[in-house]
Amino acid sequence: GALGHDAAITPDPFDAATARRLMAEAGFPDGFALTLHGPNDRYVNDAEIAQALAQMWARIGVRTAVATMPSTLFFARAPRDENSISLTGWSSSTGEADTSLINMVATPTPERGWGTVIRASHYSNPETDALLERALATIDNDERGAAYRRIVGIGVQRDLAVIPIHHQVNV
């Protein structure tokens, strides 16, 4: 796997009862409404994935309107922060995790170039930022890999800054 890959990470099972309980504990016993924005021509079955998410979220009280559009329109909205929640994808042309992690779980910091183009979320956590700084400052692959795994453990697994749902393989 890629540097920082953690084979021990497995998807959480869908558990509507627990999700409804957690929503109530968070102050949303009757759920809430949002719009899921996404492209309809960028990823395999992207519009269908958005519809499936809306149907699953409805089971826990999240009333979801789906707004899919051509990717040229969708991606133009992101820098203006016009999307409520987005179906989007990330990859790395270098095989390194830094670019993806900077855009998914780093605090937007223009002077560092972090999160200045497209943000996957409004997530901000000093702990993931410090780990990312450490990973970017070393050439020790073991140290970088450990930092990447910890960043994903905090920002993705624990805090759900992003929710990975689909891995597209291109050939």
Residue ranges of each PLM-predicted region?
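N-terminal secretory/targeting leader peptides
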Residues: 37, 54, 82, 100-101
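Paired acidic/hydrophobic, glycine-rich loop segments that form the ligand-binding mouth/hinge
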Residues: 84-89, 164
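Extracytoplasmic/peripheral linker and loop segments enriched in polar/acidic and small residues
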Residues: 7, 21, 59-79, 102-171
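Long, His/Glu/Asp-enriched segments that create or flank divalent metal/ion-associated functional microenvironments
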Residues: 53-58, 65-67, 87-89
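Short, solvent-exposed loop/turn and secondary-structure capping segments
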Residues: 46-50, 97-101, 164
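Solvent-exposed loop/turn segments at secondary-structure junctions
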Residues: 2, 40-44, 71-73, 91-95, ...
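Append "and occasionally in soluble cytosolic enzymes with long acidic Gly/Pro-rich linkers
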Residues: 1-55, 59, 122-131, 139, ...
